[in-house]
A protein has these predicted regions:
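Sequence termini and other peripheral, non-core segments
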Residues: 14-17, 38-40, 179
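Low-complexity, Pro/Thr/Ser/Glu-rich flexible segments characteristic
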Residues: 26-49
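Subset-of-secretome marker
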Residues: 41-179
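Intrinsic disorder/low-complexity detector
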Residues: 5, 19-20, 124, 136
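Sec-dependent bacterial lipoprotein signal peptides
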Residues: 1-19
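Bacterial lipoprotein signal-peptidase II cleavage site
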Residues: 6, 19-32
Length: 179
């Protein structure tokens, strides 16, 4: 049962840890008595992956590992890449492979509107190892829509996620930063 709980926690960690970096451009319209004027709000900082810093975190158990690579600039999380591997023969339960496939399918279904628009989600099974590979490019995602799917996202006022808060959450969940 403990392994099942760990498995579930590992599988859904990325879904609950999603952050944001999408920027919204807002337009305002001012109407004069005889003339309409359109103005644009002051642009916010747009982040790019080109000059991002990188940090790698890992969590391991006897039944698998999670490796998460984070890209960030200043205190803004820009992208998350995660590879979760599960050794099927070391998992508890009657049919852990089917359980993993079902859970992964449910997660992929929940994310389907974002796939190809900032989210990639893939699974593979080979030689007793089930692998889930996913990435979230927060510079491309519509973060407001993502917040609708995951209401617990801790978005800041500028629609970004704090890298330092994200990192702290990983460390609190048992991840170790790789040097």
């Amino acid at each position: 049962m403990k392994n099942t709980m760990k498995l579930s926690a590992l599988l859904f960690t990325s879904a609950f840890l999603l952050g944001a970096c999408g920027q919204e451009k807002k337009e305002e319209t001012t109407i004069a008595t005889t003339q309409a004027t359109t103005t644009t709000a002051t642009p916010t900082t747009v982040y790019s992956l080109e000059d991002a810093q990188k940090a790698v975190f890992e969590a391991a158990s006897n039944s698998g590992t999670d490796t998460m690579t984070l890209y960030y600039k200043d205190d803004v999380l820009l992208k998350e890449e995660k590879v979760s591997t599960f050794i099927i023969s070391k998992l508890a339960g009657d049919n852990p492979l089917e359980m993993l496939k079902k859970a992964a399918g449910e997660t992929k279904e929940k994310l389907k509107v974002f796939i190809g628009k900032g989210v990639e989600y893939n699974t593979d099974y080979k030689d007793d190892v089930f692998t889930i590979t996913n990435s979230y490019d927060y510079t491309k995602l519509d973060m407001q829509k993502l917040k609708e799917v995951y209401p617990n996202l801790n978005l800041r006022d500028d629609k970004t996620l704090s890298y330092s808060e994200f990192k702290e959450g990983l460390l609190n969940r048992g991840y170790k930063e790789k040097q």
